[in-house]
């Protein structure tokens, strides 16, 4: 989906008019109309405000061009599981179980994170060593552990 489609769908699902959105974002109703027609896309700062207003990530607003994973534990991220920063903005880098209010929830080593994640993996019961090997290869590639 394109931004115009995602934006329009989210606005309508929240029961907001174009004018309501314009007032909340401090833009004109004409700007909102142009976004919905696909004539323009908002600037980055406005995208952040829309993200907060609609409760979705910028990645989702832009049609999910990237597959996001938590940069601490490697869990695939959807809007429902993304962390929030102290200002309430969605943090697209971490899941809600690793990050809250600008800090990591677990102060742990990489190996402790591996062991913490294994029970939550779908194949943990059948192949715990395979899961362990996968996590040991994945975690060093993530921002928290670089």
Region locations from a protein language model:
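Conserved hydrophobic/aromatic packing and binding residues within compact polymer-binding modules
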Residues: 7, 21-22, 32-35, 61
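Short cysteine-rich clusters marking metal-coordination/redox-active sites
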Residues: 70-73, 95-98
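DNA major-groove recognition helix of helix-turn-helix/homeodomain DNA-binding modules
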Residues: 45-60
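Short linker/helix segments within small regulatory modules
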Residues: 81-92
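Short basic helix-loop element that most often maps to the first helix and adjoining turn
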Residues: 5-24
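Short metal-binding segments enriched for Cys and/or His
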Residues: 97-116
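Recognition helix of helix-turn-helix/homeodomain-like DNA-binding domains
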Residues: 25-41
């Amino acid at each position: 989906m394109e931004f115009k489609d995602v934006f329009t769908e989210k606005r309508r699902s929240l029961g907001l008019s174009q004018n309501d959105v314009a007032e909340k974002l401090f833009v004109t109703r004409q700007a909102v109309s142009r976004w919905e027609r696909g004539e323009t896309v908002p600037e980055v700062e406005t995208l952040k405000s829309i993200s907060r207003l609609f409760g979705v990530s910028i990645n989702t607003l832009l049609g999910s061009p990237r597959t996001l994973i938590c940069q601490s534990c490697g869990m695939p991220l959807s809007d429902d599981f993304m962390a929030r920063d102290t200002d309430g903005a969605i943090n697209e880098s971490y899941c809600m179980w690793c990050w809250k209010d600008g800090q990591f929830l677990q102060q742990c080593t990489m190996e402790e994170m591996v062991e913490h994640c294994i029970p939550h993996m779908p194949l943990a019961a059948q192949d715990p060593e395979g899961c362990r090997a996968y996590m040991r290869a994945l975690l060093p590639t993530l921002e928290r552990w670089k």
